[in-house]
């Protein structure tokens, strides 16, 4: 939408005037109601909010972007427990509670309790938000992994950081590997704009009655949470419709009409055939619901991936999160050297853009997958997806981990060595995972100078 059109749009579809992003100033001497602005918020449709509403560009941190997304998301319950680099985010959500934008907010005792309480709130039918990072993700994983099977449309923010010793608070997204395989929808934000958009869209997607699953919005720690970037935001006078819990895939708990079953069948499965069958079907339905989320991801955030210059590219970089930002600069440098190269940024990790990748990568000779983790979870997803559909050599790397940075030169070196056959000088971890290569090379190895 053009800047001129944004300036001309002064009302929403209901005819309510749209004010500036800044909070209105109270009259001199007037007694200020801290909840006054929140009370004036008007409900608009998700379609209008995401696709039509005019936006104003602000220069804010990722934590502030998360706050502004929650401000417009009509959240009922937010539960916090501090851990770097997420602490500031939930502190800012507490400010929203003081201003009346979030109905209930408190600090939990630790991550196990937070994830259990968030699950209880969602099970009772209210819209819930929380955030954690690194060791907090792993500590709360038992509760997090239960959300998809119980069909709880929670939105959780994961500000990924190092989890192993020697411990660091710098970005490392190995925790995403755990989240990918528990049944939840997983989105990976590259920057502050993604963080803002994905959180708001997450509530809408998760609560669709043919989905009813939690959404995890991941980012690479400090790179997004504490750095500033431009974010185009809708006016703060608008918000999403409230959660309509009775339209979900499973009934919510009704404390006024006990007893209530937390599971459709006994949680400990015995040898009864019917119990086993019900259990198996329920497990399969969780993953089927995730697949049904594809159409809503396409509708509200514009697709499971974005592609740049891939049509005639001989080399393609596939990345997600902050690695996509580094890769974009690597593409520019490679293009200046005359290399035909494209970039695919993965937005949605679950569901994974299998069909889209196969269509885009059929002609590529080389695929490079840089990551901020040791295990290479994205490279494995890419190699599995393209097996039998592409003859490209797939290089899983460079990989930096334990809080290390990823110089753009590492990515450029992988591209050049992959195309020319010249030995890479990278000391970062990489692995050759497919294509016409020597079988002795198809393994993880540490490259030396």
Cite the ranges covered by each PLM segment.
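A general structural motif
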Residues: 167-169, 286-303, 319-326, 346-353
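Thiamine diphosphate
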Residues: 2-190, 200, 220, 410-412, ...
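Generic long, charged, amphipathic alpha-helical segments
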Residues: 328-360
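Flexible, glycine/charged-enriched surface loops at secondary-structure junctions
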Residues: 42, 209-218, 299-308, 341-342, ...
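Peripheral docking tails and interdomain loops at the edges
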Residues: 370-449
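Glycine-rich beta-alpha junction loops
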Residues: 161-162, 219-226, 321-323, 374, ...
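Glycine-/acidic-rich phosphate or pyrophosphate-binding loops and their flanking alpha/beta elements
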Residues: 61-66, 293-315, 328, 332
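Conformationally flexible catalytic loops at phosphate/diphosphate-handling active centers
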Residues: 33, 214-307
């Amino acid at each position: 939408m053009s800047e001129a059109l944004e300036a001309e749009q002064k009302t929403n579809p209901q005819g309510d005037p749209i004010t500036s992003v800044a909070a209105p100033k109270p009259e001199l001497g007037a007694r200020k109601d801290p909840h006054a602005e929140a009370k004036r918020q008007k409900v608009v449709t998700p379609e209008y909010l995401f696709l039509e509403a005019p936006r104003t560009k602000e220069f804010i941190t990722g934590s502030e972007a998360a706050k502004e997304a929650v401000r417009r998301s009509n959240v009922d319950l937010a539960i916090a427990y501090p851990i770097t680099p997420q602490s500031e985010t939930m502190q800012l959500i507490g400010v929203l509670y003081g201003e009346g934008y979030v109905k209930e907010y408190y600090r939990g005792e630790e991550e196990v309790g937070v994830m259990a309480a968030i699950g209880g709130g969602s099970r009772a039918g209210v819209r819930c938000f929380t955030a954690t990072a690194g060791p907090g993700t792993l500590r709360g994983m038992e509760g997090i992994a239960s959300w998809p099977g119980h069909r709880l449309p929670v939105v959780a923010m994961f500000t990924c950081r190092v989890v192993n010793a020697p411990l660091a608070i710098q970005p490392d997204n190995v925790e995403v590997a755990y989240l990918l395989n528990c049944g939840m929808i997983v989105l990976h934000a590259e920057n502050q704009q993604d963080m803002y958009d994905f959180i708001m869209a997450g509530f809408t997607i998760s609560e669709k009655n043919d989905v009813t699953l939690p959404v995890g919005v991941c980012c690479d720690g400090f790179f997004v949470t504490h750095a500033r970037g431009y974010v185009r935001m809708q006016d703060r006078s608008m918000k999403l419709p409230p959660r309509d819990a009775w339209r979900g895939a499973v009934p919510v708990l009704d404390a006024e009409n006990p007893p209530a079953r937390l599971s459709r069948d006994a949680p400990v499965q015995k040898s009864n055939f019917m119990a086993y069958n019900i259990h198996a079907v329920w497990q399969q339905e969780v993953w089927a619901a995730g697949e049904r989320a594809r159409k809503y991801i396409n509708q509200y955030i514009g697709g499971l991936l974005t592609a740049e210059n891939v049509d005639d590219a001989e080399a393609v970089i596939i990345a997600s999160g902050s690695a996509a930002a580094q890769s974009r600069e690597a593409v520019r440098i490679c293009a200046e050297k005359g290399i035909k190269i494209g970039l695919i940024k993965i937005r949605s990790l679950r569901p994974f853009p299998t069909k889209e990748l196969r269509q885009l990568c059929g002609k590529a000779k080389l695929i490079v997958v840089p990551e901020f983790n040791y295990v290479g979870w994205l490279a494995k997803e890419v190699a599995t997806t393209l097996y039998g559909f592409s003859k490209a050599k797939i290089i899983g790397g460079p990989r930096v981990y334990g809080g290390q940075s990823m110089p753009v030169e590492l990515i450029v070196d992988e591209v050049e060595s992959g195309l020319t056959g010249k030995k890479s000088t990278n000391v970062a971890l990489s692995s050759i995972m497919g294509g016409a290569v020597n079988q002795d090379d198809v393994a993880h190895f540490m490259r030396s100078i």
